[in-house]
Regions:
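Alpha-helical transmembrane segments of multi-pass membrane proteins predominantly involved
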Residues: 1-190
Length: 190
């Protein structure tokens, strides 16, 4: 973080170029070499199908547009843009993993990756007191919501006894499982 130097414009242009190549490559892969069957990777924690490909394309296009608009803003404000583009691409990778996650652990890790990038991007302008205040507030609210999400994941794991996202519906259990009513009662009492 710091003031603008001569390589800031070049760094942003290189990042935007590679994001464009990545988006076009992914779009060509989706349109011409699309795999019809759903694929699972990483011990079935990641699922790749038609819906995830559409969402990945959306996230790549959004990242490209954010980088173009953000680069203009950073040049106008006189801030370095190298870290901005790295954080944008890391957040994009986290969002792509988030839409592909098929397991609560992968969902949580991907969501936290995105959140950490967003915390830093919110407080990117270190010369602005408002930017730093917004970053701290976002960090505090994000930590609180992350804890609540983790408690919810543990609750679903306790009821379903399966950490997979689709396994949490627990079709093998009876519909009148007393354990589920116990957890629901504890949730409602708070």
């Amino acid at each position: 973080f710091g003031k603008k130097d001569s390589s800031s414009v070049r760094t942003g242009a290189i990042a935007i170029f590679f994001q464009s190549v990545l988006f076009v490559g992914h779009l060509l892969d989706y349109l011409f070499w699309h795999h019809s069957a759903a694929l699972n990777f990483f011990s079935d924690m990641i699922s790749q199908g038609l819906q995830t490909e559409v969402m990945r394309s959306f996230f790549l296009l959004s990242s490209l547009l954010v980088s173009i608009i953000g680069h203009r803003y950073l040049c106008r404000k006189g801030l370095k843009s190298g870290e901005f583009h790295h954080l944008t691409m890391l957040a994009t990778a986290g969002l792509m993993l988030l839409c592909q996650s098929n397991h609560f652990l992968m969902l949580f890790v991907a969501l936290e990756t995105v959140a950490l990038c967003f915390y830093t991007l919110v407080a990117y302008n270190r010369d602005s007191a408002k930017s730093l205040e917004a970053g701290i507030k976002y960090l505090i609210f994000g930590a609180l919501s992350s804890a609540l999400l983790l408690f919810g994941i543990v609750l679903l794991y306790g009821v379903g006894a399966n950490p997979e996202a689709w396994g949490a519906s627990y079709p093998e259990h009876e519909s009148m499982d007393p354990l589920s009513f116990h957890y629901l009662g504890n949730l409602m009492s708070e």
